[in-house]
């Protein structure tokens, strides 16, 4: 994920990507459908609408200075997961370091995980274990925003909540089949939600990259 910010015409670009998998299709992340953006002025989001396509998403938050009079810019990125064993999903971030505390910080970008749902009839429903969104990421930052003690907008979880490779989700197997290829209906979908509230930031340009990784997770019987 990359973020780029400019004074008065703040442009925030997030690029989501997936780390190369070493587990074949036994553990897999792909696009979960077309991402959406609301509340943006001159903003956009691009991604793959096909659930068998790679997860590569570019988000342009557009104008995020007070010239954007909307309360928040919200982006929802559906992410499809497939596994035939217990799994965990981790996210790592690089970039977005500003020495000036009045410039955009990682803590200014809300980030949460919501809306788990089956991806078709071959998605596995387990009765002995559930899919767990790790604290503090189980929230929609766009509806949980508040004004902090420092006068800046705060969220229950943000990009600053990521430290190294941070596990955000884990659970039991996701797929009924053992196909070596992605199918249209063989897993689960979760929504990664990003929120940025238009406000005053010191001028500058920033960038960051988010990498999503799926790997074998803790024991979770199905």
Language model features with spans:
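N-terminal regions of proteins, emphasizing targeting and processing segments when present
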Residues: 17-19, 113, 136-137, 147, ...
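Positively charged n-region of N-terminal signal peptides that target proteins for export
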Residues: 1-5
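N-terminal small/polar-rich segments of proteins
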Residues: 23-137, 169-222
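Local beta-strand/beta-hairpin segments that build beta-sheet-rich folds
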Residues: 74, 142-182
